[in-house]
Amino acid sequence: GSYDLSAHTVWLGDRTRQPDGAHVEFARHVRNPIGVKVGPSMKPEELITLLDTVNPHVQKGHVTLITRYGESKVKDLLPEHIKAVQNSKHAKAVIWCCDPMHGNTVTSPSDPKLKTRMFSAVVSELTSCLQIHASLGSVMGGVHLELTGDEGVTECMGGSMELSDEDLKRCYLTHCDPRLNYEQSLDIAFLISDVLKSQRRGIPVNNALSQALLRSNRVEGNP
């Protein structure tokens, strides 16, 4: 196969993952890493068929499964997808990545033209993914976040800055999807860091998350 030099990882989404479609046909012939978005509309058997198509030789690390359900659906859907992969030849070949952003996009209560995300919903889906993977003997190998290093951006609500709906218009700059700002991004980074450090010390994921969330709440000034 050849490389697609226009990108590093090329990915397939809900509208481009049809087994007989042009995008899948293209993806199966390139040597780039392949990302596959896995959401509520993806049936477990469809996921395995897609993996068989784009990674027939079961090359380890070639495919990253990017899960994006929304906080209200992740606990029902992610376990079934993990189990389907575990029962297939791809069990040890895929990389699992959590995208806690896209499934939690909502419209602003005060302005339906503005898309936003609740920081609490992002954290909820992220922590649910960590717990589910650990409970099933799987590993969450990555996190996909949309963020900016600009501290003043106000596109997502919540976090240590406690941004509200009224704050959104103050510095809403995105032309596409709402991003975590500098402080909100660090909130997430420190949470993940705390969990990983606790795991290295042999602390179970649930306990590690409880400790990390407690520290996070203290940083935000909550009782």
Model-predicted regions and their roles:
Residues 95-103:
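Short acidic/histidine-rich active-site segments
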Residues 60-61, 92-94:
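Short, structured loop/turn "capping" segments at alpha-beta junctions
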Residues 1-71, 113-120, 124-128, 132, ...:
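Active-site-facing alpha/beta catalytic cores
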Residues 100, 138-139:
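Generic detector of intrinsically disordered, low-complexity, polar/charged segments
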Residues 76-88, 123-134:
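A short, acidic, amphipathic alpha-helical segment used as a generic capping/interface helix at domain edges
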Residues 105, 109-114:
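C-terminal structural cap/anchor segments
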